[in-house]
């Protein structure tokens, strides 16, 4: 009797981030389910999509979520690059009722410009930085700390996530765990 529906609107991802298992595990990005299939009369949904913004089907489902008035949490995070590079997406997301935060990822300094642009686009659409939550992948502690401090200075909510590979060969360092606990 969980108060929120849980499910995937899409599966897969268009990106091939070297640290991510999603493309290997789920394959190419594709539609998976209609929000009404698992909302089942509830008003809240925790959505586990990995790159819903890169999918036409996913964007249609977000429009439907808005029409239904459902509150959502894209728990795996949204791709800030999609928001930065497609201005209408920021406007679309500004009309969503969020359960708590709009979640995104800031996994490396390579996406710094896109992250900053996504934050600015969302702010222009009326979203407050305090409602913007960012997963921060921790591989190199100093680099992750710089990204955390940058997000904090922008008024956003960073969440440090120590990296571990899927073969078990790489485990987070003690410093990475300390950073995560501190953050």
Which residues make up each language-model segment?
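Glycine-rich beta-alpha loop elements in corrinoid/cobalamin-binding modules
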Residues: 1-6
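Local cysteine-cluster metal-coordination motifs and their immediate loop/turn environment
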Residues: 8-23
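Alpha-helical protein-protein interaction elements
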Residues: 11, 66, 98, 173-174
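Short catalytic/ligand-binding loop motif for oxyanion handling, primarily in non-cytosolic enzymes
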Residues: 16, 26-28, 54-56, 144, ...
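Core AdoMet radical
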Residues: 21-118, 129-139, 157-162
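Anion (oxyanion) recognition and catalysis
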Residues: 66, 123, 149-152
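Short helix-capping segments at alpha-helix termini
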Residues: 125-127
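Auxiliary Fe-S-binding modules of radical SAM enzymes
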Residues: 137-183
């Amino acid at each position: 009797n969980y108060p929120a529906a849980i499910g995937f609107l899409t599966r897969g991802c268009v990106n091939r981030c070297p640290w991510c298992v999603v493309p290997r595990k789920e394959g190419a990005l594709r539609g998976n389910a209609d929000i009404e299939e698992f909302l089942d009369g509830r008003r809240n949904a925790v959505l586990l999509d990995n790159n819903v913004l890169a999918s036409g089907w996913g964007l249609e489902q977000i429009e439907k979520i808005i029409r239904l008035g459902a509150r959502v949490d894209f728990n795996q995070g949204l791709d800030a690059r999609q928001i930065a590079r497609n201005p209408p997406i920021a406007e679309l997301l500004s009309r969503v009722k969020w359960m708590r935060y709009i979640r995104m990822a800031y996994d490396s300094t390579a996406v710094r410009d896109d992250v900053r642009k996504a934050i600015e686009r969302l702010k222009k659409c009326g979203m407050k930085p305090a409602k913007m939550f960012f997963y921060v992948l921790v591989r190199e502690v100093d680099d992750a700390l710089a990204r955390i401090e940058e997000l904090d200075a922008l008024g956003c909510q960073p969440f440090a996530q120590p990296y571990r590979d899927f073969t078990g060969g790489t485990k987070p360092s003690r410093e990475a765990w300390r950073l995560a606990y501190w953050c």
